[in-house]
């Protein structure tokens, strides 16, 4: 590894120590459906976001709720204390497209229609309100 590349890798590694996040990969729902849920909680306080997700009727909400609980646990693990009410916020959440499984459905006159079964990756960052303002 080159010297400059090594230095930038070390900087990135140090920056990750102050970030608290959780990732969910290869979720078998379309990214479009997952983004609807992600947009609901972006920027919210974590306890309020958990309440919103708990009472949401969307299937993706249960997965994002579990991911949010994991991110909170990661924050508590790194800081060696419990998170207090109003302290943590969802600073960033984004949904990226994952692998697409392609299937064929029989169609009239000997043709086949392609069905795309999409998946996605969700990344969720939590932090304090001051961290949220610094990152923007």
Curated annotation (Swiss-Prot):
Keywords: Ribonucleoprotein, Ribosomal protein, RNA-binding, rRNA-binding. Belongs to the universal ribosomal protein uL22 family. One of its GO terms (biological process) is translation. GO terms for cellular component: cytosolic large ribosomal subunit. NCBIfam families: rplV_bact. Signal peptide: none annotated. GO terms for molecular function: rRNA binding; structural constituent of ribosome. This is Large ribosomal subunit protein uL22. It comes from Bacteroides fragilis (strain ATCC 25285 / DSM 2151 / CCUG 4856 / JCM 11019 / LMG 10263 / NCTC 9343 / Onslow / VPI 2553 / EN-2). The keyword Transmembrane helix does not apply. It comes from the Bacteria. InterPro entries: Ribosomal_uL22, Ribosomal_uL22_bac/chlpt-type, Ribosomal_uL22_bac/org-type, Ribosomal_uL22_sf. Transmembrane segments: none annotated. This protein binds specifically to 23S rRNA; its binding is stimulated by other ribosomal proteins, e.g. L4, L17, and L20. It is important during the early stages of 50S assembly. It makes multiple contacts with different domains of the 23S rRNA in the assembled 50S subunit and ribosome. Part of the 50S ribosomal subunit.
